[in-house]
């Protein structure tokens, strides 16, 4: 068993209302003639505002992938360090306590990876184990928590951390007037989050408040590579998003959740807290419909989408933090649930302390 000891979310300082972002986008080169559909998609996203890593007026001139990626590396390390220090403080631990660091991102390329750069900035021990996760996209927050558990099962005295940083706005140089690209401009924001987890023996020493990470399950769906991902070129990273995404959720998700819970002699009625990635309005509705959830079950998911947009892998960790702050009843079960490129689902079973 592993225990979550701290969670912290970090957001860049530049915050704009959805209407401000929309007004800026319609002035991007080549997008003015698509103003009607841009405004319609942005209005339908149910996003009230987003944080961006750059001032809004700088984006129209950011046309080179290399320039955008240099900004990504600098700002991602800054935000990642902020998130990790916050989570360590929440756990009453220090950077020198970290035995393993995992990082998750899909919105920029860094070699050496973000974990090496964050380790250098914070002075992590030279024997720290590193696990960079790239390409998982929106599922990486839940999958990263699952991988912390996998590691700590064999290292019950250790401290393992996950740092997720997504600067989705830096993919704007690749935006073209396709439905996928324009949906992305309506939903995605910038942000980071970190989780500190400890093995069961270390949990007793630091009096970790939980929740416990009990189990996880991954599901990779057949013939679904086309559903979501990046089209990568000299333009940078351009979003690929199939309208079949919600159909795939409705086809597979209920059975995935039911069989996973069955293995623990649980049902959906036993889940007191649903920690679900926000995706977008259609994704949230598909999850709720597939699992026959009452409206209040995904209230924190809807709230996160409205307040900060979709932060890709970092979103579910912000929602995890918000859920912990609500203090679910001791002994009750929680379920983390996210989906991403592959196409795939990651489920993580929690138990509140």
Curated annotation (Swiss-Prot):
CDD domains: CHS_like (cd00831). Its EC number is 2.3.1.-. The active site is at residue 138. GO terms for biological process: chalcone biosynthetic process; DIM/DIP cell wall layer assembly; fatty acid biosynthetic process; lipid biosynthetic process; polyketide biosynthetic process. It is an enzyme of class 2 (transferase). It catalyses: methylmalonyl-CoA + hexadecanoyl-CoA + malonyl-CoA + 2 H(+) = 4-hydroxy-5-methyl-6-pentadecylpyran-2-one + 2 CO2 + 3 CoA; methylmalonyl-CoA + octadecanoyl-CoA + malonyl-CoA + 2 H(+) = 4-hydroxy-5-methyl-6-heptadecylpyran-2-one + 2 CO2 + 3 CoA; hexanoyl-CoA + 2 malonyl-CoA + 2 H(+) = 4-hydroxy-6-pentylpyran-2-one + 2 CO2 + 3 CoA; dodecanoyl-CoA + 2 malonyl-CoA + 2 H(+) = 4-hydroxy-6-undecylpyran-2-one + 2 CO2 + 3 CoA. Substrate binds at residues 180, 241, 277-282, 312. Pfam families: Chal_sti_synt_C, Chal_sti_synt_N. Pathway: Lipid metabolism; fatty acid biosynthesis. GO terms for molecular function: acyltransferase activity, transferring groups other than amino-acyl groups. Homodimer. PANTHER family: 1,3,6,8-TETRAHYDROXYNAPHTHALENE SYNTHASE, HYDROXYMETHYLGLUTARYL-COA SYNTHASE. Involved in the biosynthesis of methyl-branched alkylpyrones. Pks11 catalyzes the extension of medium- and long-chain aliphatic acyl-CoA substrates by using malonyl-CoA and methylmalonyl-CoA as extender molecules to synthesize polyketide products. Palmitoyl-CoA or a similar long chain fatty acid derivative is the likely substrate in vivo. This is Methyl-branched alkylpyrone synthesis polyketide synthase-like Pks11. It comes from Mycobacterium tuberculosis (strain ATCC 25618 / H37Rv). The gene is pks11.
